[in-house]
Amino acid sequence: MLTVQELVDDNADKIPFSWIAGHDAADRAIPDDGMAAADLVGHLNLIHPSRIQVFGQEELAYYTRFDLRRRMHHMDELLIGGVPAILLADGLTPPQDLIDQCAQHQVPLLSTPVAAAQLIDLLRIYLGKKLAPTTTVHGVFLDVLGLGVLITGESGLGKSELALELISRGHGLVADDAVELSRTAPGVIEGHCPQLLQNLLEVRGLGLLDIRTIFGETSVRRKMRLKLIVHLVRATAQDKFERLPLQDITQDMLGLPIRKVMLQVAAGRNLAVLVEAAVRNTILKLRGIDTLGEFMERQAMAILQSSK
């Protein structure tokens, strides 16, 4: 559960906050009920009291326009609604009654010199990433030709060896073994590596390899967007393979369908070349070029012409 203090600490470099009142409530939780980041923070809004309320110049002018009794009424509405924190932007000084109310009811009241609009944008980006749906999957996550590729498959099939071959061909490692995936936007899944495993690749027989030290800075990536899953299976597996699948295979990841390619592992197959070819083909499909569809159209035209 994200707290107000964590929010302050995590954004200290971009947003310098100063505590005014309610410091004892620094561990107050910011609600996460599957709400979008845009609903978690915004300008002063009494209709949505449960979000972080930001006072800019216009909001403070609106608030101070009322008499003390009306202000107390508005504050009561925010408090009953469970406001997590009140932030004053533009370096504004709050009226004493606002300070007293926040101190009395233990509501965090903070000030920052950052402009209100910029403050809201920064916090929405932060909250969108911090509270994004996440999962951890087993596999190797790579940057192949600028595309985020997750290599999966049962243990012992050579996922790490394949990753090492791709890295030696100029591609980049994001994460090995434990890949943390986050849905940071409606159509975006980002993958990154846990801090403990950064830059490391475990290869059977060689142990742990520090890819960054061995291959240089350009051989690792901090994060990538997941666009393709390459699933390795044994050549003896009973899975039924279609040589020319009429429809793209997808796999659900955090509620999003991700393109999936299945490759059989067998002696003599150059999997690194196959993965690169799969990535290039995926890039073409993302650009609207369907090689199989074009072939089927040509085939249909040829059959039509031969029947005349």
From Swiss-Prot:
<dbReference type="GO" id="GO:0005524">
    <property type="term" value="F:ATP binding"/>
</dbReference>
<keyword id="KW-0808">Transferase</keyword>
<feature type="active site">
    <location>
        <position position="243"/>
    </location>
</feature>
<keyword id="KW-0479">Metal-binding</keyword>
<feature type="region of interest" description="Important for the catalytic mechanism of dephosphorylation">
    <location>
        <begin position="264"/>
        <end position="269"/>
    </location>
</feature>
<dbReference type="InterPro" id="IPR027417">
    <property type="entry name" value="P-loop_NTPase"/>
</dbReference>
<keyword id="KW-0067">ATP-binding</keyword>
<dbReference type="InterPro" id="IPR011126">
    <property type="entry name" value="Hpr_kin/Pase_Hpr_N"/>
</dbReference>
<dbReference type="InterPro" id="IPR003755">
    <property type="entry name" value="HPr(Ser)_kin/Pase"/>
</dbReference>
<feature type="active site" description="Proton acceptor; for phosphorylation activity. Proton donor; for dephosphorylation activity">
    <location>
        <position position="177"/>
    </location>
</feature>
<dbReference type="InterPro" id="IPR011104">
    <property type="entry name" value="Hpr_kin/Pase_C"/>
</dbReference>
<feature type="region of interest" description="Important for the catalytic mechanism of both phosphorylation and dephosphorylation">
    <location>
        <begin position="201"/>
        <end position="210"/>
    </location>
</feature>
<feature type="active site">
    <location>
        <position position="159"/>
    </location>
</feature>
<keyword id="KW-0723">Serine/threonine-protein kinase</keyword>
<comment type="function">
    <text>Catalyzes the ATP- as well as the pyrophosphate-dependent phosphorylation of a specific serine residue in HPr, a phosphocarrier protein of the phosphoenolpyruvate-dependent sugar phosphotransferase system (PTS). HprK/P also catalyzes the pyrophosphate-producing, inorganic phosphate-dependent dephosphorylation (phosphorolysis) of seryl-phosphorylated HPr (P-Ser-HPr).</text>
</comment>
<dbReference type="Pfam" id="PF07475">
    <property type="entry name" value="Hpr_kinase_C"/>
</dbReference>
<dbReference type="Pfam" id="PF02603">
    <property type="entry name" value="Hpr_kinase_N"/>
</dbReference>
<dbReference type="GO" id="GO:0000155">
    <property type="term" value="F:phosphorelay sensor kinase activity"/>
</dbReference>
<keyword id="KW-0511">Multifunctional enzyme</keyword>
<keyword id="KW-0460">Magnesium</keyword>
<comment type="subunit">
    <text>Homohexamer.</text>
</comment>
<protein>
    <recommendedName>
        <fullName>HPr kinase/phosphorylase</fullName>
        <ecNumber>2.7.11.-</ecNumber>
        <ecNumber>2.7.4.-</ecNumber>
    </recommendedName>
</protein>
<dbReference type="GO" id="GO:0004674">
    <property type="term" value="F:protein serine/threonine kinase activity"/>
</dbReference>
<feature type="active site">
    <location>
        <position position="138"/>
    </location>
</feature>
<dbReference type="InterPro" id="IPR028979">
    <property type="entry name" value="Ser_kin/Pase_Hpr-like_N_sf"/>
</dbReference>
<dbReference type="GO" id="GO:0006109">
    <property type="term" value="P:regulation of carbohydrate metabolic process"/>
</dbReference>
<dbReference type="GO" id="GO:0004712">
    <property type="term" value="F:protein serine/threonine/tyrosine kinase activity"/>
</dbReference>
<comment type="similarity">
    <text>Belongs to the HPrK/P family.</text>
</comment>
<dbReference type="GO" id="GO:0000287">
    <property type="term" value="F:magnesium ion binding"/>
</dbReference>
<feature type="binding site">
    <location>
        <begin position="153"/>
        <end position="160"/>
    </location>
    <ligand>
        <name>ATP</name>
    </ligand>
</feature>
<feature type="binding site">
    <location>
        <position position="160"/>
    </location>
    <ligand>
        <name>Mg(2+)</name>
    </ligand>
</feature>
<keyword id="KW-0547">Nucleotide-binding</keyword>
<feature type="binding site">
    <location>
        <position position="202"/>
    </location>
    <ligand>
        <name>Mg(2+)</name>
    </ligand>
</feature>
<keyword id="KW-0418">Kinase</keyword>
